[in-house]
């Protein structure tokens, strides 16, 4: 089985030992505490689940700046984005060396993790700008990732953490949320050797379904792990429970038995385009995937990134020896009226745009909101029905 990034064994930060978990939970209630941002909570979940292995906690400022500039920490370890825990104020934990991190997304703000504080540092505006430029390719405050990053405060607390729970992800999505540890175990149970991972933050239509099948066929994979983001997105995106239902329906009806796993992970989307694509590859290797699909404008938003920047970054900026996972580079896929099947558009040079069935996201939302199913060549009818029911449930503007 493919090894985790940077180590022979996965190093999740969740406290699995029941006695230790009980002791730590009791201790945490009496520790100085802070409510962290939603993004930091998601990162704590990812650390706990083993996705960010071998990192053991939140970065100090020097490591965060180094990661932003070179995708390596000051000790040379590879990690493609800064992992900061930013606060508006650290007054509540002043002088403390051990603190509790509380969850902003669960009622009552329960303790999510315990941190051994190694540094409390102020981040300057210039340092924030440097990180946003390097990671997001822009400092534009309208970029949703930049806006979120800049809204979290300027005090960075760092240090290793011990994670006590997986926030709302495990309770709200018990059939879908999986840790990297659990996915590795299931891959071994199934006897899969070659595994394709597919990232999605949206429902999957015919083009996505066929892309997974194309990738599996091309690399002779035993199965595909459809790995959906369960955390916060930008306003207007389809909520996770609806995406979950639509994707599960598609997988159950249209993939051969024992060739697909539908899973999810707890993380707030960065919309960091190429840098986020590298992070996605990083933690897909940690969960046991040997191949990862990266398509056009992967993890992008608006017009901030070129259509294939998320692919070329692996040639231009990622050292060849840090990731063992292989990238399956995809173009847009669409149904060809000429050929009667879904194809990658780059593989049909004799086609004109009119030869494909393509619908914009806006047009699809309009159709679904009006109770009109997209063509079956675009969307499976069972998937379309789930989405139509969701759009009809929304307040009419």
From Swiss-Prot:
Keywords: ATP-binding, Nucleotide-binding, Nucleotidyltransferase, Transferase. Pathway: Sulfur metabolism; hydrogen sulfide biosynthesis; sulfite from sulfate: step 1/3. GO terms for molecular function: ATP binding; sulfate adenylyltransferase (ATP) activity. The keyword Transferase applies. It catalyses: sulfate + ATP + H(+) = adenosine 5'-phosphosulfate + diphosphate. The keyword ATP-binding applies. GO terms for biological process: hydrogen sulfide biosynthetic process; sulfate assimilation. It is an enzyme of class 2 (transferase). InterPro entries: ATP-Sase_PUA-like_dom (IPR025980), PUA-like_sf (IPR015947), Rossmann-like_a/b/a_fold (IPR014729), SO4_adenylyltransferase_pro (IPR020792), Sulfurylase_cat_dom (IPR024951), Sulphate_adenylyltransferase (IPR002650). It holds the Pfam family PUA_2. Its EC number is 2.7.7.4. Gene3D superfamilies: HUPs, Sulfate adenylyltransferase. Belongs to the sulfate adenylyltransferase family. This is Sulfate adenylyltransferase. The lineage of its organism: Bacteria, Pseudomonadati, Pseudomonadota, Gammaproteobacteria, Chromatiales. The gene is sat.
């Amino acid at each position: 089985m493919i090894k985790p990034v940077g180590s022979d064994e996965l190093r999740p930060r969740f406290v699995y030992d029941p006695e230790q978990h009980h002791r730590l939970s009791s201790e945490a209630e009496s520790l100085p505490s802070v409510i962290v941002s939603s993004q930091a909570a998601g990162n704590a979940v990812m650390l706990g689940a083993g996705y960010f292995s071998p990192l053991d906690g939140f970065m100090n400022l020097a490591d965060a700046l180094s990661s932003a500039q070179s995708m390596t920490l000051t000790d040379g370890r590879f990690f493609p984005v800064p992992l900061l825990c930013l606060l508006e104020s650290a007054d509540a934990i002043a002088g403390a060396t051990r603190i509790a991190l509380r969850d902003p997304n669960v009622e009552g703000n329960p303790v999510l993790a315990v941190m051994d504080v190694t540094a409390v540092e102020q981040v300057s505006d210039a340092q924030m700008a440097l990180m946003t430029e390097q990671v997001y390719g822009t400092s534009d405050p309208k970029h949703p990732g930049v806006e979120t990053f800049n809204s979290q405060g300027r005090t960075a607390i760092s240090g290793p953490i011990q994670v006590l729970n997986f926030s709302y992800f495990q309770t709200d999505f018990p059939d879908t949320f999986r840790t990297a540890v659990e996915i590795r175990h299931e891959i071994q149970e199934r006897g899969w050797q070659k595994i394709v991972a597919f990232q999605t933050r949206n429902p999957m239509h015919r083009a996505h379904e066929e892309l997974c099948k194309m990738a599996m066929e091309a690399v002779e994979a035993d199965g595909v792990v459809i790995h959906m983001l369960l955390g916060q997105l930008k306003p207007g995106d389809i909520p996770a429970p609806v995406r979950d239902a639509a994707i599960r329906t598609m997988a159950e009806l249209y993939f051969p038995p024992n060739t697909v796993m539908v899973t999810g992970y707890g993380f707030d989307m960065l919309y960091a385009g190429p840098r986020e694509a590298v992070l996605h590859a990083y933690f897909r290797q940690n969960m046991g995937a040997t191949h990862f699909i990266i398509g056009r404008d992967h993890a992008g938003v608006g017009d901030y990134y070129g259509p294939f920047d998320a692919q070329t970054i692996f040639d231009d900026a990622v050292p060849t020896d840090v990731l063992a996972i292989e990238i399956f580079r995809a173009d847009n896929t669409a149904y060809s009226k000429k050929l009667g099947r879904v194809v990658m558009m780059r593989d049909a040079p004799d086609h004109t745009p009119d030869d494909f069935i393509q619908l914009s996201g806006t047009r699809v939302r309009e159709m679904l909101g009006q109770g009109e199913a997209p063509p079956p060549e675009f969307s499976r009818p069972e998937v379309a029905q789930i989405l139509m029911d969701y759009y009809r449930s929304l307040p009419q503007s």
